[in-house]
Amino acid sequence: MSEPRKILVTSALPYANGSIHLGHMLEYIQTDMWVRFQKMRGNQAVYVCADDAHGSAIMLRAEREGITSEQLIDAVRAEHMGDFADFLVDFDNYHSTHSEENRELSSAIYLKLRDAGHIDTRPVTQYFDPEKQMFLADRFIKGTCPKCGTADQYGDNCEACGATYAPTELKDPKSAISGATPVLKESLHYFFKLPDFEAMLKQWTRSGALQESVANKLAEWLDSGLQQWDISRDAPYFGFEIPDAPGKYFYVWLDAPIGYMASFKNLCARRPELDFDAFWGKDSSAELYHFIGKDIVNFHALFWPAMLEGAGYRKPTALNVHGYLTVNGQKMSKSRGTFVKARTYLDHLDPEYLRYYYASKLGRGVEDLDLNLEDFVQKVNSDLVGKVVNIASRCAGFIHKGNAGVLVGADPAPELLAAFREAAPGIAEAYEARDFNRAMREIMALADRANAWIAEQAPWALAKQEGQQDKVQAVCGLGINLFRQLVIFLKPVLPKLAAAAEAFLNVAPLTWADHRTLLANHQLNPFQPLMTRIEPAKVEAMIEASKEDLAAAASQPAGNGELVKEPIAAEIDFDAFAAVDLRIALIEKCEFVEGADKLLRLSLDIGDAKRNVFSGIKSAYPDPSALEGRLTLYVANLAPRKMKFGVSEGMVLAAGPGGEEIYLLSPDSGAKPGQRVK
């Protein structure tokens, strides 16, 4: 028998400045299912995580709420832990990056990098808010685009024309925190010499540690040459002070991944069988996996392994990268009620419904996953209630009525039982490869076979016939054993259902190896309903409650620590407005722009003509194809603008503060391409 594997697993650290939503839960459920499978197989799998608790955003929110940053992150951590626990995510440890373990490790790693010559310093000139007495990151500066003249744009890019620029190029800059006019000020910054590790990273990213598509994307960065990474921020800042630099703090992305190590170290202090160096030492034979979203690949696949290498630690065995969550084929939307917080979901629906649905759609690739709410209801009701639970509910009553609840050990269908046993290695292989959707398909195919066989045997009809009681017990006994097999296969996904089934079956917690055995002459406990069907009305209630969450947030005082209230622009007369030719446009094609961080290329049909537009909305629409076929509003008479990537022939209209919160405007149903907006 082979030795159990030593496996350390992490999920990305959620930021301690907001609630967990269903997009976040995709990753934690995916990771939890994989870890539970490993533990069922007898491996020493350890799952750690923590709140990412540093940065200006946290400091500013705490200030706005009149509490300390520590009080804020403690409250948010408690909220996060409650959400994860109720979604049955079973961390071995859930810590915080604002911990002594993380302070010690961050300082030690920095000093090792410094002593090895991997740290550089140089002066940096940037905007400074004279009222708040703090340097301003790009997102904390707003002003007029130096390229197209659009007001109220961020400090690094224009969402109107897609131009990128330095914050110092912005016209009429204002602090988005205080509204004050910022001044330029010089400060000494600390840099990690990432180019020192270019050769190592080129090898490591092609070593099998990454999905091929991720490795290909990183190759673009590596081939264009790596730049030094700014790892310092000036006071005031909520974080850890750099050991040899008073008033300078580690940038949040330096100490955040070290939080994985810190959480594990915190666990080691409570579990003597765990040795920190056995998992993190340079020559560790343990496996280390990071489950992350595709938006933070660069930090985990470039900066993080370079830091570990430079400080004398091991590198990850692999990064398991997943895509984004969409709902009903579109980006999660607060106004449509599809931006659903974890707690709002839990207030209305069973967490195992979502765990199963995610499992049924999650593959090992980086593709986005769509939560189609109609399909969600149908799939859960059909698969879990109509197939799996149905087997037990069909058979249990006959065993209790006809044999006092004792399950006999007969095997009236050896070929069917053999099919279940023969399927186990393939299902295990799918779990191991994170091909959860394949595992669910194979499990449900077995459930279909079991239900078809039971229907063919018709124990309900046999029970009415003289002399058929032994056959009824044999059929139903095998039915319960097949149900037990399915529960074993589904336990990583449905731990609560599995626990209820174990209570009914009157057995100890099931392991993966238990699929090789059968219950025989075994006393069952009375059967209780294991799962109920999803009522569509409850899904609708969840959507409405999510809209109420938005309304409640909108009723709060304006401002989130990053933005000041946006004033109404200067008054114009009707002729000035009428000069803008707004048209309905059909998005025929939408695609990424090679080499552009923020742009999408939209091919538009405006009725009697085609137009090509570049729009800075990539951060909000990570899957461009989701926009294809949509109608939007288009400025048709804006002068064409020559850009680095081609000519942009007009502009599409969107609302929102930027980043992920950009909302492309759409007309009401019935509008046609080319119609003028009046």
From Swiss-Prot:
User: How is the cofactor bound here?
Assistant: Binds 1 zinc ion per subunit.
* Subcellular location(s) per record: Cytoplasm
Its subunit composition reads:
Homodimer.
User: Can you name this protein?
Assistant: Methionine--tRNA ligase
* One Pfam entry name: tRNA-synt_1g
> Gene3D superfamilies attached here?
HUPs, Isoleucyl-tRNA Synthetase, Domain 1, Methionyl-tRNA synthetase, Zn-domain, Nucleic acid-binding proteins
Give coiled-coil spans as residue ranges: none
Record domain tRNA-binding: where: 576-678
What Gene Ontology cellular component terms go with this record? cytosol
Q: Which HAMAP family match?
A: Met_tRNA_synth_type1
Q: In the Enzyme Commission scheme, what number(s) does this protein have?
A: 6.1.1.10
Q: Please report the organism this UniProt entry assigns to the protein.
A: Pseudomonas aeruginosa (strain UCBPP-PA14)
The record's section on SUPFAM superfamilies has:
Anticodon-binding domain of a subclass of class I aminoacyl-tRNA synthetases, Methionyl-tRNA synthetase (MetRS), Zn-domain, Nucleic acid-binding proteins, Nucleotidylyl transferase
Does Cell division appear among the keywords?
no
Alphabetical UniProt keywords: Aminoacyl-tRNA synthetase, ATP-binding, Cytoplasm, Ligase, Metal-binding, Nucleotide-binding, Protein biosynthesis, RNA-binding, tRNA-binding, Zinc
UniProt short sequence motif 'HIGH' region, positions renumbered to this chain: 14-24
Q: Which cofactor does it need?
A: Zn(2+)
GO MF, any single term: tRNA binding
Q: Which family does it belong to?
A: Belongs to the class-I aminoacyl-tRNA synthetase family. MetG type 1 subfamily.
Q: Which reaction does it catalyse?
A: tRNA(Met) + L-methionine + ATP = L-methionyl-tRNA(Met) + AMP + diphosphate
Q: Where does ATP bind?
A: K334
* Residue window of motif 'KMSKS' region: 331-335
